[in-house]
A protein has these predicted regions:
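A charged, aromatic-enriched C-terminal amphipathic alpha-helix characteristic of glycosyltransferases
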Residues: 54-59, 330-361
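Donor nucleotide-sugar binding/catalytic pocket of nucleotide-sugar-dependent glycosyltransferases
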Residues: 132-186
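Conserved donor-binding/catalytic core segment of Leloir-type glycosyltransferases
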Residues: 178-216, 226-229
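Nucleotide-activated donor-binding/catalytic signature segment of Leloir-type glycosyltransferases, i.e.
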Residues: 230, 238-257
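Short alpha-helical donor nucleotide-sugar binding micro-motif in glycosyltransferases
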Residues: 264-269
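Aromatic "clamp/platform" in nucleotide-sugar-dependent glycosyltransferases that forms part
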Residues: 277
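Short hydrophobic beta-strand element within catalytic cores of glycosyltransferases
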Residues: 294-297
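Conserved acidic donor-binding segment of nucleotide-sugar-dependent glycosyltransferases
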Residues: 310-319, 326-330
C-alpha cells in the first residue's frame, strides 16, 4: 500500500519507455546509467539481447508484440536499433506519443564484414525510424553527419518518387548528446611502457593493424608491455593469436576482465590505442583517458572532434602508428581532459532533454 504523498509523487513522475533492441555492452551501460541516475523519471525498460543483429533490427516489433506495458507513456526513448515505424504502426495508441530516437551508431557508416551480405534493410529501418521520431539525438557529430550523408547517397540511388529535403528535415530535429562515462581511478604509479588494448577483437576494430605495428615496434628493439583486454570469441581471433605467438613475453594480461580488474589495468596503462574503422563515440578510449592513459587514435571517425592532432595518426597506416607509438614510448604526452563526457557534466543535459516542457518538433 502506498501512502498518499508517495502515491502523488509516483503519479507526478513522467513515465518514459526506454526501448533498447540490442543490449550490447555500450547500450547496456547507457540504459543502466540513465535509469539509475535520472530517478525522478518513472522508467519502463524493454531490452533484447545483443545477438543475432539482422533479426534484432528487423524483428524487435514482433518480439515485443505482446510485451508492451498497458500504461501509455508520456515519452518513448528508443535506440536506433528499434524499428520505430513498424512499432508505431502495430500499436495505434502510440501514434501521438512523442519519441526521441537515440543513435549509438548508424547503419550508413557501419562497415560490413566478409561474413555479412550487403543489405539496405538495416538502413531503411533507421531512415523510417528517424522520419517517425520527433527528435533525433546522436552521440557525436560524426555519427550525425555520416547518417545524413548516407541518407543522401541512398536517396540519390532510388529511381523516382523521392521526396525533397529529407535530410534537411531530419537535421532540423537533431542534436548531439553523448553517452556519459564514469571516470576511472587514476593511479600515479603507472607502468611507463604499458600499451592498452580495451576493444572487442573484431573486424570493425581492425586489430591486425595494431598487431602489425607492435611487431614492427618490437623489431626495432623498442621495449614495451601489453594489457590485452576486451571481448573476444571462444576461438582465439587471428590477430590476438598472432600477438600471443610473436609477443608473448610482452603480455602482462590477456583476458576479458571484470570491472574491478578493468579499472586496475586502465589506471596502470600509459598509452591506449585504437585502430578502429568504425567508431561513433569511442567509449573505451574515453574511459582509458579518464584514467590518464594517453590516446593514440586514427585521424578519422569521431576522433578528430575529441582529440588534438598530437594524439592522432593516419588511418590504417601501420608505419604511422609504429612511429607515433615509438615517439610516445620515449616521451608520453599528458592525457587530454575528457571531463566534459563525465556523468556529472551530462546529467543535467540528459534531464533537460527528457523533461521537455514544449512539444517536440
Amino acid at each position: 500500500m502506498f501512502f498518499p504523498t508517495e502515491l502523488m509523487r509516483m503519479q507526478s513522475k513522467q513515465t518514459i519507455w526506454l526501448l533498447s533492441a540490442y543490449r550490447s555492452q555500450s547500450h547496456a551501460a547507457w540504459a543502466d546509467w540513465l535509469t539509475q541516475t535520472l530517478t525522478e523519471i518513472n522508467w519502463c525498460t524493454l531490452e533484447l539481447p545483443g545477438r543475432h543483429f539482422r533479426w534484432r533490427i528487423r524483428g524487435n516489433p514482433l518480439s515485443w508484440l505482446h510485451k508492451l506495458p498497458e500504461e501509455t507513456p508520456d515519452l518513448i526513448l528508443a535506440t536506433s536499433m528499434v524499428d520505430l515505424a513498424t512499432l508505431k504502426g502495430l500499436h495505434p495508441r502510440l501514434a501521438n506519443i512523442p519519441v526521441i530516437y537515440y543513435f549509438h551508431e548508424n547503419q550508413f557508416a557501419y562497415p560490413a564484414s566478409k561474413q555479412q551480405h550487403d543489405s539496405v534493410d538495416p538502413q531503411m529501418v533507421q531512415l523510417y525510424g528517424a522520419i517517425a521520431a520527433n527528435r533525433l539525438v546522436f552521440n557525436s557529430n560524426y555519427n550525425r553527419q555520416s547518417f545524413l550523408s548516407g541518407i543522401d547517397k541512398l536517396l540519390n540511388m532510388l529511381p523516382d518518387e523521392v521526396p525533397n529535403n529529407v535530410t534537411g528535415d531530419l537535421k532540423s530535429k537533431s542534436q548531439i548528446l553523448p553517452v556519459a562515462i564514469k571516470p576511472m581511478q587514476n593511479k600515479q604509479n603507472k607502468i611507463s611502457n604499458l600499451i592498452l588494448w580495451n576493444h572487442r577483437w573484431e573486424y570493425d576494430k581492425a586489430p591486425e593493424v595494431f598487431v602489425d605495428a607492435l611487431i614492427k615496434l618490437n623489431n626495432k628493439g623498442i621495449d614495451f608491455k601489453l594489457a590485452l583486454l576486451g571481448e573476444r570469441a571462444k576461438k582465439t581471433p587471428p590477430a590476438l593469436l598472432k600477438i600471443e605467438n610473436n609477443l608473448h613475453d610482452k603480455i602482462i594480461i590477456n583476458e576479458k576482465v571484470n570491472s574491478e580488474k578493468y579499472q586496475h589495468y586502465l589506471s596502470q596503462s600509459s598509452i591506449v590505442v585504437s585502430t578502429a574503422i568504425h567508431e561513433f563515440q569511442g567509449l573505451a578510449i574515453l574511459e582509458a583517458v579518464s584514467a590518464s592513459a594517453t590516446p593514440l587514435v586514427p585521424d578519422d571517425l569521431c576522433y578528430p572532434e575529441q582529440y588534438a592532432d598530437i594524439y592522432r595518426y593516419r588511418p590504417n597506416d601501420r608505419d604511422a602508428l609504429t612511429e607515433k607509438l615509438q615517439l610516445f614510448l620515449s616521451s608520453t604526452p599528458a592525457a587530454p581532459d575528457v571531463s566534459h563526457w563525465y556523468s556529472d557534466k551530462l546529467k543535467n543535459k540528459w534531464n533537460t532533454l527528457l523533461n521537455f516542457t514544449a512539444p517536440l518538433t
